[in-house]
Curated annotation (Swiss-Prot):
This is Putative antitoxin VapB51. It comes from the Bacteria. Possibly the antitoxin component of a type II toxin-antitoxin (TA) system. Its cognate toxin is VapC51. Keywords: Toxin-antitoxin system.
């Protein structure tokens, strides 16, 4: 794991800490990053599921 020196909004950090149930800055930041990337993974998976469910003719047209 890499170390980074960043300025963090204290109010946002405290709100995230409360929301995520974490106690340390490290745990809070890591949990927030995991949550943010998890949401993206879910959106991509949903988009791929939608594409897979489309009839083959519609999928062929999507690339034109």
């Amino acid at each position: 794991m890499a170390k980074h020196l960043v300025d963090i909004d204290e109010q946002a950090l405290n709100m995230a800490r409360t929301e995520l149930g974490t106690t340390t800055i490290k745990d809070t930041v890591n949990a927030a990053l995991r949550q943010a990337t998890s949401q993206r993974v879910q959106r991509v998976a949903a988009a791929l599921d939608t594409l897979a469910a489309a009839p083959p003719e519609d999928r062929a047209e999507a690339w034109r």
